[in-house]
Amino acid sequence: MAHKKAGGSTNNGRDSVSKRLGVKRFGGQVVLAGNILVRQRGTKFHPGTNVRKGKDDTLFATMDGRVVFSKKGKFMYQYISIEIT
């Protein structure tokens, strides 16, 4: 009797869709109010002047201008600001 036993199951075989996180507008780029600057989980980047933080920690511009990255404070946090041109 030619029988083949059932193959064992595997724990692999699935993958989640990427969330497309990261910096969307880089230093020196000109942006419009409402443009998304960074998509992030947590606050790797903190909002500086003319930048606000959304409920999912996304940083977005509140004014038209040029993107500026800087590090400030005791712990050298990274801030993103908009310099009005």
From Swiss-Prot:
The encoding gene: rpmA
HAMAP family for this protein: Ribosomal_bL27
The UniProt record lists the keyword Ribonucleoprotein: yes
Pfam families linked to this entry: Ribosomal_L27
The keyword Lyase appears for this protein: no
InterPro entries membership: Ribosomal_bL27, Ribosomal_bL27_CS
Protein name as annotated: Large ribosomal subunit protein bL27
Gene Ontology terms: biological process: translation
Biological source species: Vesicomyosocius okutanii subsp. Calyptogena okutanii (strain HA)
GO MF terms held by the record: structural constituent of ribosome
Family to which this protein belongs: Belongs to the bacterial ribosomal protein bL27 family.
Alphabetical keyword list: Ribonucleoprotein, Ribosomal protein
